[in-house]
Each structure stands twice: as structure tokens, then as C-alpha cells.
């Protein structure tokens, strides 16, 4: 009972912090427009939109905290393909296999949260709020719910009409080294600092054995021997067996970076960030200073949320997030 009270009290404190942050943004002249988007986009047309999304996210995460990682991963897998246009939500049809049915996306979770928020919003403001905005807001709210930083994002994204399985080949592989990650993300406008900060999202969630078992077949000096035994034990249950990225799988903190320092990164693409001199100092900095990680992460997430957005005639506002109008 005491633990529950403390968690509820912490939520209240964090809510007050959010209010203070938003007030400070207003006072110092926070940029309310970005790339044709606006912080106040729904102020008149659907003022309850953000609260509805937040309620859907909070209710779902209270029932299943592991879904926080799913919502953050959903945003990344959406935005990195064709931009932040909710293409990841479209279902396959008899004439087209959509992104969500790619092997890279089969483990994505949280679609029902987006559906719930969209249905409730449509009941209040039909045809106004895009699915792309809901995905971006849901990821933001999931970060905060799990204990991470609060950040605001501009709204006004339109939903795309294309979702093809072949486009998912552009998603970064868990087998890339740091130089390859920097190159891949750099092509989309991200810095090495962004790459390391965004990788910190792995402080939440799990990886499946199929994504790291190759590290166990040959000696890997970058992998702690005791942790290697842990991974082997996990994989004994099959390719779909799950291994948490760090010791606090449902808490957004800097434990992920501490794990990398101890050669206990689950994915090759995780551990390479510590093994590579170009990114090691960033890992060490975030492991030492969680506040610095939080600040850089929210900046990188704003950038991710604004990636190649569609505006006006470039897209539409779907009535149902799973199909085009």
C-alpha cells in the first residue's frame, strides 16, 4: 500500500512539473511552429485531443506497463519509413502487403491503444485529428508515464496513403555497428549524439533471441561472459524468447547505458556504442548523468517526431487508422 501511495504521489509531482515546464515554455518564447506544424494546431478544432490520447495511453499502461516500449518503437518504425505519417498502422489488403506485416514489425505492440484514442477522438471531433499525430503524442506520453522526460511536440501531421512491406528494408538492423548507425541516421538528419540518445529508448522493453543469438555462436570479447550465459539461457527457449535490455525494463532511466559499460548490451547495435571511441564518451556521459540523457533524448525525439511529415494535400486525416479513406 505504501509503495502504491508513493507511486501515485510521484505521478502528482510529475504532473505539476509538466505544468511548470509548459508555463516556462510560454514565458521564454518556446518555438510553437516547426516545419509547418503548430503546438496549438488543435486548440480550436479539437481542444481535448491531447488529453484523450494521454488517457488512452495511461489506462493501457496501468494494465500493461510493457506497452510503453511498444509505443515508442512504433513511432520510430513509422517515422523512419516514409516519414511520420502513420503508415505503420495500415492493414494489408488483398492487393498489398503493408509495413506492419514485415518480419521487422511483427513484434510491434500498442495498435489497440492508438485505435482506442482515435475512436474516442472521432466521437468528439470527427475528421480532425490525424493518426500520425496520435502516434507521436502516444509515444511522448509513454515516455513520461514510464518515468522519462516530458516534451511537447507540434501537431498537424497528415496521414499517408502508402504502406508497403518492401519499404521496411530501410529500417536499421540490430546488427549494424556504430559507424553504420551514424551513417544511416545521418542520412535522415540525425547526429551521433542523437543516435546514442535515441538508442537509450532501449531502457524500456525486450529483445527477442532471434535478434541477438548470432553473438553467441562465436567468442565475442565485447560481451561479458556471465551475461553471455544469461543470453544463452534465454535463447534455450527459442527464437521468440525475450531478454530485457536492462535490469529496469519498465522504467525509463539511464540503466541501459550502465549495462553497456558492463559489456551487457543485449544487441550488437547496443554494445557497439560503447566499444566505438566516437560514441563511447556519450555512453559514459549518459551513464553518469541521467538528466543529460533525458535532455538530449527529448531533443532527439522531437526531431524524430518531425521527420518528413506530410502536410495538407500530401496526405489525409483517416477516419480509421487501419485503412485509407
Swiss-Prot record:
Binding site for Ca(2+) 1: 78, 83, 85, 87
S-S bonds: 46-125, 79-84, 131-321, 209-235
Enzyme class: oxidoreductase
Keywords: Calcium, Disulfide bond, Glycoprotein, Heme, Iron, Metal-binding, Oxidoreductase, Peroxidase, Secreted, Signal
Glycosites: 177
The species this protein was found in: Arabidopsis thaliana (Mouse-ear cress)
Signal peptide span: 1-36
Protein name according to UniProt: Peroxidase 47
Similarity section: Belongs to the peroxidase family. Classical plant (class III) peroxidase subfamily.
Gene label: PER47
